Amino acid sequence: MANQSTETNQPSNMQTYGVPIYAADWIPEVDVRSKIIMDPEKSEDDDESSSSSSSSRSCIVLSGGGGEGRSGISNVILICRVDLNTNSLSEQPLGRLVVGSDLPYRMAVHPREGGLICALPNSCKLFHWEDIMSREDNQAGESEEVIKELRDVGQQLALAFNPEGSVLAAGAEDGTLRVFKWPSMNTLLNESQAHSSVKCLTFSESGQFLVSLGGPVCRVWDVNASAAVASLSKEKDEMFASCRFSVDSAGNEVLYIAANTERGGSIITCDTKLWKRKWSKPIKKNSISAFNVSADGKLLAIGTLEGDVLILESTRMQTIQVVKKAHLGLVTALTFSPDSRGLVSVSFDSRARLTMIEQKGDKPGVRWWLLVLLIVLLYVVAYYYMKAKGIIP
């Protein structure tokens, strides 16, 4: 069981940060080490790279708030500490930046040292880690940059960097898909009718392909050719919810699509050579609101409208861990730690929750069945042995 927070009755792996949370991601370790001061009293010389010290430096960034109006709830970007060794989140954010009346609804963290891009109601803005950490008045200022090419473009519902951080994609509520080189912002693609509304974006591990999802269609784009090369359509009553690229155990790229139906959710696995669906795994009685894949490709995470969190093994799609009522409301985002040991989930309930991945092992029921089978086999062998020796007729 997780340790209890010192000031509340909730476990230390679940913290309440005072605002509805819409997005979450892990901050690259190089940024944590160089730009986010974790422990001012600790000497910089004491920088031995061990698994323990690396875990203690882990940080996540969260964004959310009350939006426009007079709700009294601030719109903020938060930096919080995560300790995988003790299964805990910091009670108070390490950094907190108020961004005025604009809700940071979606975000993309640069995979190297490029900071954070947030999608605000009408524009996208670049934030630097040191500004989130060091601003004395906790208010966004002129150092936060509105990205010129994404100014006055309406609400962006999806943002994504390619794995190298050299390409940025933005998907708009009006269905426009924009792809740029980063950081030059030279346009690679500007498709005004990619979808009725772009809901999700994901780059392939190689960076060659970008998948955009919106409504009943999932489109595949060749980034280098700046053109669509395939489309995947829904079947029957499916409604696509999210998508993620990953790599399977054989080193092949695979595309996962999370969908909802009247019977519940499902995870669709797609071949990335023929761009055809291979199979679909129903997730009965669970409507999917958030989806992600671990960095090592071995695990899938699902957040539901009911606030549950499910973790699946990716090869056979077996559910290996369930956290019922992880949140009081629908799960808005999920993000695995870079080493795939932990999962952070967030929600409208203002909470962030850290779930440690249980180590593989035989379940007690399986061990009992193996023991029973062994006893039966020993009995059969003993019976025929004694019969052969004439001990029993």
UniProtKB/Swiss-Prot annotation:
Lumenal side: 389-393
GO molecular function: guanyl-nucleotide exchange factor activity
Residue ranges crossing the lipid bilayer per the database entry: 368-388
In-chain residues carrying the UniProt-annotated modification Phosphoserine: S43
Residues exposed to the Cytoplasmic side: 2-367
Region: Disordered, residue numbers: 41-67
WD repeat copies, ranges: 151-190, 193-231, 283-322, 326-367
Entry GO CC: endoplasmic reticulum; endoplasmic reticulum membrane; Golgi apparatus; mitochondrion; plant-type vacuole; plasma membrane
Keyword Kinase in annotation: no
SUPFAM superfamilies for the chain: Quinoprotein alcohol dehydrogenase-like
GO biological process, one term: protein transport
Modified residues (N-acetylalanine): A2
Location(s), subcellular: Endoplasmic reticulum membrane; Golgi apparatus, cis-Golgi network membrane
Note: In the process of transport, may migrate to the Golgi apparatus and function in subsequent transport events.
PANTHER family hit by this protein: PROLACTIN REGULATORY ELEMENT BINDING PROTEIN (PTHR23284), PROLACTIN REGULATORY ELEMENT-BINDING PROTEIN (PTHR23284:SF0)
The protein's name in its UniProt record: SEC12-like protein 2
Organism whose genome encodes this protein: Arabidopsis thaliana (Mouse-ear cress)
Gene name in the database record: STL2P
